């Protein structure tokens, strides 16, 4: 009897050692190291650089409104464009402090409502924080104020100097930039403490840092990069009818530059790359979890998309009008990224895509 009991105990111990291990036990990957790299070397520096460009934009706006002249207008446009380009490197991080401050909804709703902007300027009475003004503020609204709709620099300058509502227009411009600066400052400040939360929220649940990051990347790429910057303007969502007025930076005519800055920073984020350093990224995570083939597809498709987007020229709206098929071809390259990004990678890492999408990819 005792011999039989001993055999049973040994058998039970043997079976317990044969239990399937959790995913975290089966595969070895330094998730904490990846989050530290992404947070410390990519996200925080991106916001800090963006804040610096917004500070410069604010100073340039003060200089221009105090003394409106052509050199100051041109300098303001340079500062505006630089801030807009640097925003592209932050837009993907719509979680944590960015979500708390609703950066995307406040900074980059386009096409902007020019009629509403004109009414706000004419009345001199406005509140840019109300929901009804969501499409009359941020970078797209500033784009319209500084460039106008195919109007000369002399005319634009006159709207800030001699026109009936010149004082109101200066006030509106300053209010828009102050709004961007205020929310940028708040977000950068919040990341000072949130970075610890980001680096220590391990695991793969929806609320984990990995879950937030992968969901944010997918939502951004699909809705705001692929569709917003290319698909919608070229007519993918309108039965092939082009909508060139819906390009980003339509009035300043540097839509393709914004697209390229956005896609390049997205590619670097996936690779964990900052500057010339290739740190731990989602690519390494996939390889560690036997997802080398998925990583290879993502790398190749992203690289192909970067090359394709670099063939676009500004003004993108004009290229859409003159050669719609060439822009549709770029969209096709962007589209190839979707399956490995949205389906294969999250499945391999055990991350649930939790945002809603109704366009059928």
Regions found by a protein language model. Give the residues of each.
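Sec-dependent N-terminal signal peptides
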Residues: 7-12
